[in-house]
């Protein structure tokens, strides 16, 4: 939904409105979407959080660029806010797919406290949204786990030179190529071909 104060992030909710109209787009819940839900719930007077937790949620969101997103949200009319709210609340934490006989688990940050025997539905949202896996982290042997949240520049401690590239460690694939960094760019993984695409 947002990151920092850059002009390109001032229209995060406009982008979500566009995405909500596209049946071919599946948006997974990320930590910024979760922060927006918590903060906007509190700011709108919803009783989803206690007062102390609500104030903490707003501070956390604002520390992560939420002020710019709040201004964008406030520009929406009531119908657009309903669409956004429904879209945010419907975002899944993960998506399992099979493409060309390859199994994939797509999620935002990874799986904290991972065990291959642990059912996915037993992971708390925070274990998926805020996970920062180590570079040598592996997950399942029978499927690819594709995630972002941790820019590859941080995952590799900046040891890679040149423009950022999608990071692979066995079946664990980090596609966050750190657009916010000078060496960053948008990294996409084509599940049909397993080829990297960069913008």
Language-model features, listed with the residues they occupy:
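DEDD superfamily 3′-5′ metal-dependent exonuclease/proofreading module
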Residues: 156-157, 188-190, 198
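Active-site glycine-centered loops adjacent to acidic/histidine catalytic or metal-binding residues
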Residues: 1, 30-31, 149, 176
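Active-site micro-motifs of SAM-dependent methyltransferase domains
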Residues: 2-3, 34-35, 113, 152-153
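Active-site neighborhood of divalent metal-dependent phosphoester bond hydrolases
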Residues: 3-95
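Short acidic-glycine loop/turn motifs at beta-strand connectors
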Residues: 98-101, 190-195
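Alpha/beta-hydrolase fold catalytic core
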Residues: 182, 196-199
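Acidic, His/Gly-enriched loop-helix segments that form or flank divalent-metal centers
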Residues: 53, 60-174, 178-184
């Amino acid at each position: 939904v947002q990151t920092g104060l850059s002009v390109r992030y001032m229209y995060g909710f406009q982008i979500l409105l566009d995405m909500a109209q596209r049946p071919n787009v599946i948006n997974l819940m990320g930590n910024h979407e979760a922060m927006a839900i918590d903060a906007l719930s509190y700011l709108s007077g919803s009783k989803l959080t206690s007062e102390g937790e609500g104030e903490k949620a707003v501070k956390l969101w604002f520390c992560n660029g939420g002020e710019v997103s709040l201004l964008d949200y406030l520009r929406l009319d009531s119908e657009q806010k309903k669409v956004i709210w429904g879209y945010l609340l419907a975002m899944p934490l993960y998506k399992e797919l099979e493409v060309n006989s390859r199994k994939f688990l797509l999620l935002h940050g990874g799986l904290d406290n991972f065990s291959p025997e642990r059912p996915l539905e037993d992971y708390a949202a925070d274990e998926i949204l805020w996970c920062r896996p180590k570079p040598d982290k592996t997950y399942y042997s029978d499927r690819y786990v594709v995630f972002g949240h941790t820019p590859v520049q941080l995952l590799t401690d900046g040891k890679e030179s040149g423009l950022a590239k999608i990071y692979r460690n066995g079946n664990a694939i980090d596609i966050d190529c750190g657009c916010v960094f000078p060496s960053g760019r948008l990294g996409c993984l084509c599940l049909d071909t397993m080829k990297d695409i960069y913008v």
